[in-house]
Amino acid sequence: ARSGVDVRIMIPCKPDHPFVYWATYSYIGEMVEAGAKCYVYDNGFLHAKTVTVDGTVACVGTANMDFRSFGLNFEVNAVIYSEETTQKLEQRFENDMTKSTQITRNAYHQRSLVIRGKEQFSRLLSPLL
């Protein structure tokens, strides 16, 4: 994002585990400060991860971008070299953004002390999650 790349990240409002949710949220501030646009999907739970590049290549799957997913967990991703499919995934993301709330710098900095405490505690556990 700092180099001008359009980075948009969507996290679910309903977590599969509270520690995972709060650990994830603890990194949002850094991403927003770097220029990424971060959203909370208000319409349920998202598990699949999708990355699209320039409308031509996509990567979709369940793997998180962490050491546990790469070396310990059994996760799978598909790399798709199809402009048509990639553009459909981008359209789906755009549609999901209409069901999401953007996390602004201002909103992130106004979090309560309780929320900040949950985030910091969960962030300590993030290598294990």
Regions flagged by a language model, labelled:
Residues 1-129:
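PLD/PLD-like phosphodiesterase catalytic module centered on the HKD motif
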